[in-house]
Amino acid sequence: MKTVELTNGSKKKVEDRIVGRHVYGNLYGVDPAKLWDEEGLKELVREAAEVANMKLVEVRSWKFTGYHGGVSVMALVLESHITIHTWPDYEYATVDVYTCGERSDPWRAFELIVERLEPEDYVVHYSDRSSPKRPLGGTAGRIQ
């Protein structure tokens, strides 16, 4: 634990580590019209950020036309990001929700996206990306 000073001048004890939660998955059998709908996907990541208690900074998108084209949407949130990448020709999308902090809920954001895109099937993964206390010395995880 360490003590930090807040912007209002008060002090608070906090755990000295970063909390990182990463929910990501693949969606199969999604209606291609939904996967081509750039504006709809942008609105979806906005809503996902809201229900997950994330503070939205900006939403950007890119549409790639032609065979194997698709849409990529990225929401930059104060806590990290939400992305959706689509391949309408394959009725396929990937979804990535990563948050730093304990107040936001990446699961809720992921679930909303799945509910709205209505895939025939999906696979979801979770990774705890929180930082442990930093080890002293040693070379574990370092490239020499």
UniProtKB/Swiss-Prot annotation:
Q: How is the cofactor bound?
A: Binds 1 pyruvoyl group covalently per subunit.
Query: To which pathway does this protein belong?
Result: Amine and polyamine biosynthesis; agmatine biosynthesis; agmatine from L-arginine: step 1/1
Q: What is its EC number?
A: 4.1.1.19
A UniProt-annotated Pfam family = AdoMet_dc
Q: Which cofactors does it use?
A: pyruvate
| GO CC terms in record | cytosol
| Free-text description of this protein's post-translational modifications in UniProt | Is synthesized initially as an inactive proenzyme. Formation of the active enzyme involves a self-maturation process in which the active site pyruvoyl group is generated from an internal serine residue via an autocatalytic post-translational modification. Two non-identical subunits are generated from the proenzyme in this reaction, and the pyruvate is formed at the N-terminus of the alpha chain, which is derived from the carboxyl end of the proenzyme.
What does the record list as coiled-coil region(s)?
Answer: none
Active site, per annotation? 80, 85, 100
GO terms in the biological process aspect are:
arginine catabolic process; polyamine biosynthetic process
Xref: PANTHER family: S-ADENOSYLMETHIONINE DECARBOXYLASE PROENZYME
Quote the protein name from its UniProt record: Arginine decarboxylase proenzyme
